[in-house]
């Protein structure tokens, strides 16, 4: 039998030596990003550029008026989307600095509306504990200032004026919707030191990597 591999490990980001195992065990590679092709071409691995599945899976953008009606927001005021991550490791380290940034933005623009996307992978007791703990440290921010939204990420991504988010696939979705974004990431000290030593990339976030 032959082995066909779609959505390859991100060897272009770290541990390029894994390409030797790919050559040994995989008969044909289907690339999701254009720049992957040069790696497999140089390694003499048969490949086809198939494109990223997100391009065909994303729903049409949600109209701002529809989004505002759905969540009782004022379409005349700016809306900021916040994505603190879909993993506990991300949310643990990003929730507090993100809400701190929101508090500062609200000081500059009291009419700013903030929606925070809760990942369905995070259970309610854990998520709201982290959220409430982070919120309690912001003296000028209340629960009424941040609307939590679940199961509607694509609407948040497409209807907001801008988003701040953890690095991940969601950044590519925001780029496809042409939504301005700030990409951020924070984790424990030890994993950060390890990543610094094995990662080849000078930038963070799939949109930046594609542009680079």
Predicted regions and their residues:
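Nucleotide-activated sugar donor-binding and catalytic core shared by glycosyltransferases
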Residues: 1-212
